[in-house]
């Protein structure tokens, strides 16, 4: 099974979008929009569909950057995390999967964070990629 998560970053504020989950497995944990890639879907197609479902739209973006690919030890599960650079923060139209949202500054992690996202943001290689993204798309303030 493949799944995808999208971490939106606003150029004008430098902040990242997090969603407050409303599910059985990780209720009340902060995570990213995303989910399972359906049979026959590409990663990009699944990402766009999940954003349409969970945010109400797929915002126009400047760039889409692969951040991490997690593969389970049995190779049965892959999770692809992408950073999606947008010009401005937007107000998502949340579906039943989420209770709220927050745009937060880099390094200010919401708590509790979904364990998969927590693992991702604590990898040194991911932190280096995030720093490179932030240098490339610095805040326009």
Annotated model-derived regions:
Residues 1-17:
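Conserved N-terminal beta-strand and adjoining loop/helix that marks the start
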Residues 20-21:
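C-terminal lobe/hinge of AMP-binding adenylation domains
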Residues 25-28:
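A conserved beta-turn-beta hairpin within the catalytic core of GNAT-like acetyltransferases
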Residues 31-32:
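A short gly/proline-enriched turn/hairpin at secondary-structure junctions
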Residues 35-126, 140:
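Unchanged
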Residues 135-141:
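Short intrinsically disordered terminal tails
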